[in-house]
Each structure stands twice: as structure tokens, then as C-alpha cells.
Amino acid sequence: MKNAFLRWWGCGAFDVILDDVNFAFDPYLFGQNLEGIEPCYDYIFISHEHFDHCHPKTLQKLCRGERFKKLFVNPGCITPALPIDEKYGDAAFDRDLPITKHVAPEKVEVLYPKYLQDDGQWNRKFHGPFELDLGSLNVETIESGENQTPDLPTCGYLVTHKEKQISFLHIGDLHHPYPALRELRDKVDFFIHMKLGLTEWQGSNLTDRLVEIVELVRPKYFIPTHYRTDRIADPIPEGHWPPNVTDTCAFIELIREAIGEQTQVLPFTAGVEYELEMPDKKVIWKWNWHNSWSVPPWREG
């Protein structure tokens, strides 16, 4: 079995290269990364209509070519709340939506969440589809939070490769865990995490939410994403969403301290491709020394 490759591209963008099938969640690329990337995905999954998750410039580049088959989106990417610029503020724009302005309509399919965040106040029912059989892949949907209105749900995705028995859960901008997520328990290998349950220094303590969702789902591995650093090599340019984390090590260790006994936290660096040894699904950690000088400046005293 060939090894797999994973990459967090910054913000909530994440891709999975399995050789026989490749897919991406919420691609959001800039500069050389956007210019240089070739359409290599069979499927792309979009959690919601906010600009940093449903990014027209990136999707225009990726949703084409012989390999590409379908862009799966939540309803708001096609029928956003109106008027867009008023309802979404700086989170979405009339220039961008519906996404069929930028991607051929026949290449776009709307999905609805199978597992809902309802607490009894909305009593919603959607007509679906909620699941997909894509040959080698099976897809289930969850509600992922930041709904603009109750009838415009957002989507997280559990994507499972049947033969390789490897699965990825992308939760979108989910803020609160909810009981229906228990249905995913022990189905998830890699949990791609974004906002939920993060407690910054001297901020509101939200860690119980993080502990709760990990207990509900019980993933094997947990990958923190949706933050930026001040690295020159960070794939999201300075001045773009999301905000910087001031101390990445402290950020990761606080997460590890909260949930480390329940799952293994994988501290991915944005923009770096990580190889998975298959079928063990084990990350091969690679690093080397890299001199930041050509002529040592200390020679001059």
C-alpha cells in the first residue's frame, strides 16, 4: 500500500493525497502557492460560505482538469443570506457568492448535515443528501456551526477511504460540541480541528468544550489548524485571516495538556507536507538543520 500525504495549507485548508483519490477541505491559497498548484483533487469539500473557507480564486484554479469531479458545498454557498454584504459583514461578499459565479454549476453539489446541532429550539428537517458513496470514499456530514440562519446549515465532513481504512473529520468553524457527534465515535482517525474550545491567556475558559468533543468522537489523532504564525514561510500572508498565535508551542501544549490522554495531538506546520506510513497511519516526522547564513557573521567579531 502506498503511503499517504497530508498538508495543512493554513487557516482551515487541508488536503489528503491517497494516490488513487485526492481531496481537499476549504482550500484557501495565496501567492506562489496559488500560482504553482495544479488541479490534483478528485473532490473538494467546503464547510461554509465565509471567504476564508469558500475562496473563489482558489476554487477557480482547482475545480478543473481531467481529474476533478465535484465540489461539495453547504447550502449557503449557493443560496446565501441576502443582502450578502449586510448579513455577513466582512465574512462573505456579494462578489463571491453564489460560488457558481466562479465554478461551473454542473460541478457543484449541495449537501446538508446528517448530524444536527439542534437543542430543540429549531426542530429542523432537511431533504438531503446527507451522505455520499464516491466509490473508494464514503462521506458523512455534520453541522459545523456559524450558521447564518437556521435554514442555512454549515457542513463538516467525515471522509473515509473504505479499502485503506483511513478517515478524516474536518469540523469547519464549529464552536460548540453537541450530542449527535457521538455517532462518529471511534470512526475518526484524523480530527482536523479549528476554533472549538480554545482558551487564550486570560480569556474565557472554553477548554471544557474541547475535552467534550474529543470525548464524544474519540479520534486517534488530533490536528490543530485555523491559526497563523509570524513565520515568513507561513502560507497565509501577513494581514490576512486568521489571527496570529503569539506562542505556537504554548498553544499546542495547552491543547495537549487538555486532551493528550484521549488522543495524540499532531503539531503540523502550515505549508509542510507530511507523509503517512501506510497501513499504520503513522506520521513520518522529517526535519533537517538549515543554516541561515552563507558566510558566518561572527567571523567579523
Language model features: what each stretch is:
Residues 24-26, 45, 72-73, 169-171, ...:
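Structural recognition of the beta-strand scaffold that forms the well-ordered cores
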Residues 7, 83-134, 181-182, 210-301:
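Binuclear metal-ion centers of metallo-dependent hydrolases, dominated by the metallo-beta-lactamase
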Residues 29-80, 185-192:
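Active-site metal-binding motif and surrounding structural segment of the metallo-beta-lactamase
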Residues 4, 21, 69-70, 106, ...:
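A structural micro-motif
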Residues 160-211, 216, 225-233:
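Metallo-beta-lactamase
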Residues 31-33, 50-54, 78-82, 128-130, ...:
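Active-site environment of divalent metal-dependent phosphoester hydrolases
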Residues 13, 56-63, 156, 180-182, ...:
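Short amphipathic alpha-helical segments and helix-helix/interface helices
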Residues 1-39, 43, 110-186, 270-301:
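Core dinuclear metal-dependent hydrolase active-site scaffold
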